[in-house]
Amino acid sequence: MTMLAAVGAALFLGAVMTAGDFIWAQFDVRHRMWTGMTHGALMCLCLGGVIGLRAERLSRGLMVGPLIGLLAAAAFYAMAPTFGYGAMLPAWMLFWICFALLQMWLTTGTPGAALGRGLIAAVLSGAAFYMISGIWTRPSPGGPNYVIHFIYWSFAFLPGFLALFVAHPTRHSQGV
């Protein structure tokens, strides 16, 4: 069931991110800080929803997810003047660590275990994220191929969800 949950979550976030790519391209959205912050908050609303749903604490996941998105986007914009688009990788890794802590808060576990899961998610998903980064650092001259985007985004999210979900309880054992 854990593998199925991780794959389902990765496919869902792959679809969300592909829809985001479509909106950016179709409506010629310019990359500005406010558009990036909005994008991060919406993406993490969905990711928080996945974590919250799995923990049977959907509303809490939906509330905290966008805050994590804003934090990760702010980290990106703080690092971007120095690292350019390279700042996306540490921001991506930061949000996995934050989502591991959210999962711990919503379920059971210790901060140390959550940080360990978050670091594993950050490194593995960060590597996958780096491997797909060409979809926007070297865009297709004919425009985005949304099937490829969906596959790539799903691939990038899968290691993170596996790290968070494998051998982790789905519910909090106490009242939260």
Regions of interest found by a model, annotated:
Residues 1-176:
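Juxtamembrane/disordered regions of integral membrane proteins
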